Amino acid sequence: MYGKIERIHFVGIGGIGMSGIAEVLLNLGYKVSGSDLRGSEITQRLESLGGEIFFGHAAENVANADVVVISSAVHDDNPEVVEAHLRLIPVIPRAEMLAELMRMKYGIAVAGTHGKTTTTSMVATILSKGGIDPTIVIGGRLNSLGTNARLGQGQFLVAEADESDGSFLLLSPTIAVVTNIDADHLDFYSGIEEIKDTFVEFINKIPFYGLAVLCLDNGNIADVLPRVKKRFTSYGMSAQADFRATDVKLSGFSTSFVAHHKGVRLGEITFSMPGAHNVLNALAAIAVAMELDIPFETIQEGFAGFGGVGRRFHLKGEANGIMVVDDYGHHPTEIKATLGAAKAGFAENRLVVVFQPHRYSRTKELFEEFVKAFHDADVLILTDIYPAGEAPIEGVTAEALANRVRRHGQKDVTWISDRDKLCEHLERVLAPGDILLTLGAGNVWQVGETMLLRLKAAKES
């Protein structure tokens, strides 16, 4: 960036998408400040790296900033945004700052309604194993790094591309991965056709020497293939895919499959994340790695050492014979995939699910899809909707969803609003051999951590 820009301020710096960019900028030598409503492990890490963190939003926080970066969750009436405009300080979306970082490297952008974080993490892990030393900006904590960002010395930047507000169109990657296209963020998009149009525009932004990596198993991607004008390769379980998986085996937290490229057997891949959906994510990572001439043996080694991603079927702990697992899944497609993975890998275990719906708008738009998403849950408990800054919508409640799921035929469904009562209910319900799965993009993970403490205390008493 032009040398006159020295101090960069982030409004909502504790968010997973914002913090990664902030960390890379700190490591590049920029002065970084940011504000958030409360402290967290993320803000503590940024402070340890030299960032200045303010708690609460106030006009004076931007006094010395040369540019202010905001996420889509920050509104125009935020006092820091208002003050920045008064001071004629540029206010830009996080995607524009990510685009600026990507402009200095060869960008690998991973987009898609689902699977972005896991796929980005797999790509980053394999490229690192291959000696490419990429800069990494991920929307989740890569367990092997203990963070979601890293400044590499190589020529590539691997980043997650967020389609939620269309701002991923600001990016200009050399390699664009699209894991799937599904109906989501219908508070921003008019419907699936506009979503498909936007992804086509994203894919066609790559340069003539670039590559698009596209999942052929996804019907919406298959629909738009005739509109793709740039070089692409495909992946999936389909026999027509360029990169294909066969002999998929799911056992516990382990997944293995045999990878093929254009009919040629490459070899077996094994990694420690459950689920057939993660086989697809792995195929995308293989396609990217082979485009960069990383030997398949190195790719195998990268997957063998892949430690997974925070909040993606993450084992939090075990007590009294009960495993506590947390997952970020909050869309019906993600929920079905996660519960299916749990059932496939742990067929003998009872699955007790605590789901926290995320956003009133998503719950309303995808209500009937949510109703059908929990078939593989043996016990289902819903807690109140996490608003993520949205105002309530009349009639759209977790209680209404629980009632509808019950009428759909799910037998053991409960709605509990109060967290203490929810944990007390879980203490009565859980038994040795169960898997307790907390599910959602809000703060439902706290239920799992509380239950681990209670289960351990019960064991010691």
UniProtKB/Swiss-Prot annotation:
ATP binds at G112, T113, H114, G115, K116, T117, T118. This is UDP-N-acetylmuramate--L-alanine ligase. Keywords: ATP-binding, Cell cycle, Cell division, Cell shape, Cell wall biogenesis/degradation, Cytoplasm, Ligase, Nucleotide-binding, Peptidoglycan synthesis. Belongs to the MurCDEF family. Pfam families: Mur_ligase, Mur_ligase_C, Mur_ligase_M. One of its GO terms (cellular component) is cytoplasm. Its main location: cytoplasm. It is found in: Cytoplasm. Coiled coil: none annotated. Cell wall formation. Pathway: Cell wall biogenesis; peptidoglycan biosynthesis. InterPro entries: Mur-like_cat_sf, Mur_ligase_C, Mur_ligase_C_dom_sf, Mur_ligase_cen, Mur_ligase_N, MurCDEF_pg_biosynth, UDP-N-AcMur_Ala_ligase_MurC. The gene is murC. It comes from the Bacteria. Its EC number is 6.3.2.8. GO terms for biological process: cell division; cell wall organization; peptidoglycan biosynthetic process; regulation of cell shape. One of its GO terms (molecular function) is UDP-N-acetylmuramate-L-alanine ligase activity. It comes from Citrifermentans bemidjiense (strain ATCC BAA-1014 / DSM 16622 / JCM 12645 / Bem) (Geobacter bemidjiensis). It catalyses: UDP-N-acetyl-alpha-D-muramate + L-alanine + ATP = UDP-N-acetyl-alpha-D-muramoyl-L-alanine + ADP + phosphate + H(+).
